[in-house]
Amino acid sequence: MKYVEHCDVSHGRKACYLSTIKKLRRYELFKREFEGQKDFNLYPDTFTIDDLYDFYEYVENEYIYYDEHYDWYRQFHIDKKPPIKYTNNYMQTVRSHFRAFMNWMTKNGYSSNMEYKKLTIKPDVYADPIYLTLEERDKVYYTDLTKHPGLSLYRDMFMFQCLVGCRVSDLYAFTTRNITEDGFIEYLPQKTRENAVEGAPSSFCRVPLNDKAKEIIERNMDKRSGRLFPYRNKNMYAYGIKMLLLLCEIDRMVTARDPDTKEFTRYPLYMVATSHTARKTFIANIYKKVKDPELICSMTGHMPGSKSFRRYRHIDDDCKWDALEGIE
């Protein structure tokens, strides 16, 4: 816990570290309870690389142990967020957390055990980002929803996200105060505020509003409260997006992780679309037009050089042809 208190990272990252620490504690108690090692402890000074791999195997299989020993796990009060089958990327993150902790321990003289340096941490693996092409986006925008009026608001919300690249949490918070006289929408992303590290630069977003975005605001703005969109339950919004894209026949096959097996599988786009698909649509299509990450980051809230930004845009063959045309 002392490490979490002293490390200079965001609140979100600290929460991730605490989650890994809790897994370590459950692992120690599990070994004592079910494997007969009554005095088992994973001490920083004495653990071996085999102990670490045994811990990672425990984390990978904890969702199975949770079902088998449910009554025992009740003491940890994790019913609302029980263990699941984790992706390889998540498991690499757990390893990174442990390595960061041990780096801190050795740097500050709390341990001289270098076994953790034998850990191999593989790079994360992601499928290509899932987003709508401009043609698909406009097809959704112009589809006649007269017979499906319940989807009209969801369409406007989703399209607005496609046009300004905001997260759903920011979409719900927008008011007329976010709109400038020169036709921009300005805001500090909620995620940035929640995860801010003291002294770190903020990621203020300023995005021009095109005619489509202005039309959507005009249709939905509450003039009394100033809110740009009425609140809708996020689960209903997520469901509405899928129904909207199904109705609009946005059924191009894409690759995404199966939520149960965690393996990459092919799906029609409408089945895996979420509000975040709109954000990816904004980023990916702008990147095709203007391959300037810093310009795009100024509109999305990503920090320049952000690793996560790479997961939003896809360098396809058209991008490569455009690049080569510049040196012909």
Describe each model-derived feature in a short phrase.
Residues 81-96, 107, 111-168, 172, ...:
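Basic, Lys/Arg- and aromatic-enriched nucleic-acid-binding interface segment
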Residues 164, 173-218:
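Conserved tyrosine-mediated DNA breakage-rejoining catalytic core shared by Y-recombinases
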